[in-house]
Swiss-Prot record:
<dbReference type="InterPro" id="IPR050643">
    <property type="entry name" value="Periplasmic_pilus_chap"/>
</dbReference>
<dbReference type="GO" id="GO:0030288">
    <property type="term" value="C:outer membrane-bounded periplasmic space"/>
</dbReference>
<dbReference type="Pfam" id="PF00345">
    <property type="entry name" value="PapD_N"/>
</dbReference>
<protein>
    <recommendedName>
        <fullName>Chaperone protein PapD</fullName>
    </recommendedName>
</protein>
<comment type="subunit">
    <text>Interacts with substrates PapG and PapK.</text>
</comment>
<dbReference type="InterPro" id="IPR013783">
    <property type="entry name" value="Ig-like_fold"/>
</dbReference>
<comment type="similarity">
    <text>Belongs to the periplasmic pilus chaperone family.</text>
</comment>
<keyword id="KW-0574">Periplasm</keyword>
<dbReference type="InterPro" id="IPR018046">
    <property type="entry name" value="Pili_assmbl_chaperone_CS"/>
</dbReference>
<comment type="function">
    <text>Binds and caps interactive surfaces on P pilus subunits to prevent them from participating in non-productive interactions. Facilitates the import of P pilus subunits into the periplasm, probably also facilitates their folding. Chaperone-subunit complexes are then targeted to the PapC outer membrane usher where the chaperone must uncap from the subunits. Coexpression of this chaperone with individual, otherwise toxic, P pilus subunits (tested with PapA, PapE and PapG) suppresses their growth inhibitory phenotype.</text>
</comment>
<dbReference type="InterPro" id="IPR008962">
    <property type="entry name" value="PapD-like_sf"/>
</dbReference>
<keyword id="KW-1015">Disulfide bond</keyword>
<keyword id="KW-0143">Chaperone</keyword>
<keyword id="KW-0393">Immunoglobulin domain</keyword>
<keyword id="KW-0732">Signal</keyword>
<feature type="signal peptide">
    <location>
        <begin position="1"/>
        <end position="21"/>
    </location>
</feature>
<dbReference type="InterPro" id="IPR016147">
    <property type="entry name" value="Pili_assmbl_chaperone_N"/>
</dbReference>
Amino acid sequence: MIRKKILMAAIPLFVISGADAAVSLDRTRAVFDGSEKSMTLDISNDNKQLPYLAQAWIENENQEKIITGPVIATPPVQRLEPGAKSMVRLSTTPDISKLPQDRESLFYFNLREIPPRSEKANVLQIALQTKIKLFYRPAAIKTRPNEVWQDQLILNKVSGGYRIENPTPYYVTVIGLGGSEKQAEEGEFETVMLSPRSEQTVKSANYNTPYLSYINDYGGRPVLSFICNGSRCSVKKEK
């Protein structure tokens, strides 16, 4: 999840901790079930003294704002009283049929808080923005609750790292790679997101028994253990 601080006086964006936000979102990523026409995201104003406006919109995979498209967010702007909770509805349009139906499509959901105008002079007001990944998952590839498809990933040992193969129709975000479960969870690693049916090379030491951590649909961070046969490594299946 990305949170950006926006200075209302046109000062450039920069990343901050989400703990500073007044308007919060109930998740760090969203999966839109293609068998449904809509879904809702819960939002809340965690400030108990001041009302805030909440502005919502969708971006495409290139992080370009889309006014009309396969998925829209409503209402685009709403007022949240102090301590109040509300929701944003994501709905599909007829353009949804133009998306591939055999793999996921990537969008971004944005939520920006707009603080009330200060009555004091020379006060710089600050707005915070939350951005999360929004995956549209067509009905044809609908998954079961808690289904693990990430265990289809393949690691190929190459010079200076691994080439990760993602043969699935889903996006996979890899956040760790190491020679132990702890190293995969806590070691330094540059996060990569693999598109459906793609491969990507990452820098890493080579391990006899690699471990890989990823982000699942719920924001959890499970770890997979691999078994290698030569330079090719596949996930160790639980019996």
